[in-house]
């Protein structure tokens, strides 16, 4: 039997009240209730709402997918940093079961988008820093630098805290 009580399964939880509502308002060209953060994170939330409707699954699914997407980035980052597959695997496994990562990627807050782009920014910056400028054509050395800058911009367009990571 379904209990119609307000729970995390049937309603908003924590900051979802702001972000899910604002995503809904963005879809319907209404005045945005929450405007303290840049819009990109709420645009991502609105994609889930457009596909699955204005319900907890709809406003949470895209953030969950971004949380899953963090795992390969962390694996690649760990492998590039430590040059050992097993260390990258351990790091990724620990992160996959970290309570904060698990919790934050299951609710519709914009933190997950900023974090994803920060991780991607650091990964591409590490690739740039480890590039051999003697063996690589100059234009090719700029690709990871450009991607790092792009990820920084997307992070800042998701949540202002990405500015601190870029400093």
Feature-to-residue mapping (PLM):
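Extracytoplasmic catalytic/substrate-binding loops of multi-pass membrane glycan-assembly enzymes
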Residues: 1-20, 32-44, 54-57
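Juxtamembrane segments of multi-pass membrane glycosylation machinery
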Residues: 28-32, 44-65, 84, 99-100
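Alpha-helical transmembrane segments of multi-pass integral membrane proteins
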Residues: 59-66, 91, 110, 155
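Short helix- or helix-capping micro-motifs
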Residues: 91-96, 103, 123, 152, ...
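Transmembrane-embedded, aromatic-rich helix segments that form part
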Residues: 147, 161-167
């Amino acid at each position: 039997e379904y209990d119609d009580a307000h729970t995390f399964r049937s309603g908003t939880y924590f900051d979802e009240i702001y972000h899910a509502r604002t995503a809904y308002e963005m879809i319907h060209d209404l005045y945005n209730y929450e405007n303290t953060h840049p819009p990109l994170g709420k645009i991502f939330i609105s994609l889930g709402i457009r596909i699955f409707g204005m319900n907890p699954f709809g406003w949470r699914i895209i953030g969950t997918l971004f949380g899953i997407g963090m795992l390969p980035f962390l694996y690649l980052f760990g492998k590039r940093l430590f040059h050992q597959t097993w260390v990258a695997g351990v790091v990724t496994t620990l992160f996959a079961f970290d309570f904060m990562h698990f919790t934050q990627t299951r609710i519709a807050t914009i933190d997950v988008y900023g974090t994803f782009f920060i991780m991607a920014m650091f990964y591409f910056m590490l690739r740039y820093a480890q590039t051999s400028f003697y063996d690589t054509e100059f234009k090719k050395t700029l690709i990871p630098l450009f991607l790092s800058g792009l990820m920084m911009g997307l992070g800042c367009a998701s949540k202002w805290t990405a500015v601190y990571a870029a400093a």
